[in-house]
Curated annotation (Swiss-Prot):
The chain crosses the membrane at residues 40-60, 82-104, 125-145, 172-192, 210-230, 233-253. NCBIfam families: tatC (TIGR00945). This is Sec-independent protein translocase protein TatC. It is found in: Cell inner membrane. It comes from Synechocystis sp. (strain ATCC 27184 / PCC 6803 / Kazusa). Forms a complex with TatA. GO terms for biological process: intracellular protein transmembrane transport; protein transport by the Tat complex.
Amino acid sequence: MSTQLDNITSAETAPDYLDEVPDDVEMSLFDHLDELRTRIFLSLGAVLVGVVACFIFVKPLVQWLQVPAGTVKFLQLSPGEFFFVSVKVAGYSGILVMSPFILYQIIQFVLPGLTRRERRLLGPVVLGSSVLFFAGLGFAYYALIPAALKFFVSYGADVVEQLWSIDKYFEFVLLLMFSTGLAFQIPIIQVVLGFLGIVSSEQMLKGWRFVILGAMVLGAILTPSTDPLTQSLLAGAVLGLYFGGIGCVRLLGK
């Protein structure tokens, strides 16, 4: 009888298997800093390679990004303006192309400190984050940018001729695309917060009024244009993602 009680007690006091950190190795602060420095240098080197590679093929990228503007003509208003635009496009594209490698370096740095339970969430979070980011880029390219440009062109069509600075155009397009990609990460943040038990799905749902206000503010901040149509489209997408994130958290039972 006493042996059975001892077994029950030991089973209750044993650490949960999912909460264990596998292959836990003690490292000093300097070891962590050295590894962080190595990961950063590898990521920066990869970005540099990606930027150079994208710069070689930058003209097709520029032409592809000009498609939403339709028949609008672009001007180079200063010497070297198109060159610096090309560098900017290559920079954004290089980071995007090398983002899987950068993400891999981040995972390798944080992985040793994660429990088995947390590692089970890592794969779906990384995959979902990547899919949502590229979905955000596509939403901006195919929906937000054409809507904003159509508004601007039609608003002044009978007053001014549409001749745009190529630098200002690409600043608008690149900023809108990447800010939309970041805004599409909202469900991932919700899932992580729900999984960690910081916020429940009920708490997320109770604050829907503040979420609507926050979505409108976020749409105004993230869109470089000031037209209400683009801001409303982005705000609507943010709201849809937020309530979709609540559904995902509920599926986790949180």
